[in-house]
């Protein structure tokens, strides 16, 4: 079993519980170079809001820093950005789906920034 399969297996119980709650889901994906955050509808069929380190606005803010987006500073910017977009779309309450990643480092930085910017989870 490789790392990706193990991570996806760890994500299953969390996603099952979130689907029972019937609330919007803040799902993240972390690669070596970038971090992505999506808010998915309670039905699970549509992405309502998204933010990542690939967006021009985020990249412009990261231009003076080292790295392209694979660090906690970039994750903090993405967390703030996704929270701002969610509030503009009328979403305040979400369930945090860490996608099997440990709640540490970039994942924690993104979650903390989203909470500070006004998302509740």
From Swiss-Prot:
Keywords: Ribonucleoprotein, Ribosomal protein, RNA-binding, rRNA-binding. GO terms for molecular function: 5S rRNA binding; structural constituent of ribosome. InterPro entries: Ribosomal_uL18_bac-type, Ribosomal_uL18_bac/euk. GO terms for cellular component: cytosolic large ribosomal subunit. GO terms for biological process: translation. HAMAP family: Ribosomal_uL18_B. This is one of the proteins that bind and probably mediate the attachment of the 5S RNA into the large ribosomal subunit, where it forms part of the central protuberance. Belongs to the universal ribosomal protein uL18 family. This is Large ribosomal subunit protein uL18. It comes from Bordetella petrii (strain ATCC BAA-461 / DSM 12804 / CCUG 43448). The lineage of its organism: Bacteria, Pseudomonadati, Pseudomonadota, Betaproteobacteria, Burkholderiales.
